[in-house]
């Protein structure tokens, strides 16, 4: 068979048949055929490693028992503009097939924008329940960022279609929810549920800031998403503030 025919045949195979065939063609004397086999084997190994990594995230959550667990996380504590956004996600943790795992989930900051967008849709499809809540800059200026951070979690949790028996959060305890809570340092890198909440919250907020960028084009919100980059601070000094700026965060700038 020619290289083109081999490649076409492999593409039509199921995963296990393709893997077996890849081992076979490693004995082929043609470099391009052998390279194709190596590529398939490397891709399979990479996928298996990812499955093992994500299973650990699911197992982390399952350690708390066979109960309904909501993971919560926020994005937007530190920006000079825009809302703070929180999300709550309940996953099916007792997955029987690897296909049911949400591969790729991680701390949202470690993922590309494109990957976050893709995963956000998958998470919403596969989650048993999810909710997003936000409070704007005016509320942040009135109540303070810490109060708002806790409040968005309370709102998101209260809106979930399933009532969680445990809430796990990233770094901070969630107060006043009337539900048992565990907070975990670097939780978005350890817990599947928190990682998923981290992703959908960030995608929601980034998209919102992208919309604001259309109205306030001088500030670069499409790239800095409200954080205090040099260009953003320079724009504030040159053009002043917008209706979405957090005035309580700008005392040392204006």
Curated annotation (Swiss-Prot):
Alphabetized UniProt keyword annotations: Cytoplasm, Endonuclease, Hydrolase, Manganese, Metal-binding, Nuclease
NCBIfam families the UniProt entry points to: PRK00015.1-1 (NF000594), PRK00015.1-3 (NF000595)
Family: Belongs to the RNase HII family.
Record flagged with keyword Transport: no
GO-annotated cellular components: cytoplasm; ribonuclease H2 complex
Record function comment: Endonuclease that specifically degrades the RNA of RNA-DNA hybrids.
The protein, known as: Ribonuclease HII
Database matches in SUPFAM superfamilies: Ribonuclease H-like (SSF53098)
Entry-linked PANTHER family: RIBONUCLEASE H2 SUBUNIT A (PTHR10954), RIBONUCLEASE HII (PTHR10954:SF18)
Residues given in the record as a divalent metal cation binding sites: 73-74, 170
Top-rank taxon: Bacteria
Matching PROSITE patterns: RNASE_H_2
Domain RNase H type-2: 67-254
EC number: 3.1.26.4
Catalytic activity from the UniProt record: Endonucleolytic cleavage to 5'-phosphomonoester
Short name of one Pfam family: RNase_HII
GO biological process: DNA replication, removal of RNA primer; mismatch repair
The species this protein was found in: Clostridium acetobutylicum (strain ATCC 824 / DSM 792 / JCM 1419 / IAM 19013 / LMG 5710 / NBRC 13948 / NRRL B-527 / VKM B-1787 / 2291 / W)
Location relative to the cell: Cytoplasm
GO molecular function ontology, one term from the record: manganese ion binding
CDD domains: RNase_HII_bacteria_HII_like
């Amino acid at each position: 068979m020619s290289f083109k025919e081999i490649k076409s045949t492999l593409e039509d195979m199921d995963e296990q048949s393709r893997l077996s065939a890849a081992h076979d063609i490693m004995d082929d004397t043609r470099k391009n055929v052998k390279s194709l086999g190596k590529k398939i084997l490397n891709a399979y190994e990479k996928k298996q490693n990812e499955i093992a990594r994500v299973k650990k995230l699911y197992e982390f959550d399952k350690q708390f028992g066979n109960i309904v667990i909501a993971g919560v996380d926020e994005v937007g504590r530190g920006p000079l503009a825009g809302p703070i956004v929180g999300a709550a996600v309940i996953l099916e943790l007792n997955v029987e097939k690897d296909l049911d795992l949400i591969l790729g989930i991680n701390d949202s900051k470690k993922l590309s924008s494109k990957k976050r967008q893709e995963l956000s849709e998958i998470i919403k499809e596969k989650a048993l329940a999810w909710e997003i809540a936000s409070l704007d800059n005016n509320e942040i200026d009135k109540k303070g960022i810490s109060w708002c951070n806790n409040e968005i979690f309370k709102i998101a949790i209260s809106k979930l279609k399933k009532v969680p028996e445990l809430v796990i959060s990233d770094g901070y305890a969630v107060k006043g929810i009337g539900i048992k809570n565990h907070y975990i340092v670097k939780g978005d890198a350890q817990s599947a549920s928190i990682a998923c909440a981290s992703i959908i919250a960030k995608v929601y907020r980034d998209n919102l800031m992208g919309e604001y960028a259309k109205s306030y084009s001088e500030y670069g919100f499409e790239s800095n998403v409200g954080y205090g980059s040099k260009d953003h601070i320079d724009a504030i000094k040159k053009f002043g503030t917008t209706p979405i700026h957090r005035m309580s965060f700008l005392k040392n700038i204006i």
